[in-house]
Amino acid sequence: VTIEASTVKGVFWGTRTLLQMIHNQPFGLMKGKALDYPQYAHRGLMIDVARKFFTMDYLQDYVKILSFYKMNELQIHLNDNGFVEFFDNDWNKTYAAFRLESDRFPGLTSKDGSYTKEEFRNFQQMAARYGINIIPEIDVPAHSLAFTHYNPILAADKKEYGMDHLDLYKKEVYDFLDTLFDEYLSGDHPVFV
């Protein structure tokens, strides 16, 4: 068996094609030539780890499955909240989660499941070895109840938008977001690689 491609990544995807052929022909490969290339540059999915926590082991296994099917992007939805209607119309009772460790905002990280910065860095590196680009998503200005539970001053008017919206007229919101994003994007060893 010979796999040829114009890039290293192309050779890797060729190994996925070979694995699929072996899976579909368990009694041996037929003699011949196969030509395979993606129709779309971006082939991915999004997983909501905010509303439903998934362990790092699960995410790593998921990356391997995506790689087998030659997907190349996985968006990780790191923060979100439930719907106030399901929590007695009380924003203070409404479930909210932020799944990534934060040193700059102690207490922001969800207690019912989260990832350390080092785990998330390692996960992105592992995914890259399988041809998957991890796209971390911090959802703002809506779906931000975890942030407004942490600091209620960040919330928009509850009547017009709901407490899960950040008030974009407040300087405190921009200070908070600048600090939060800087924690994950800056430095010699950023969390989002």
Residue ranges with predicted function:
Residues 2-193:
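Feature activates predominantly on carbohydrate-active enzymes
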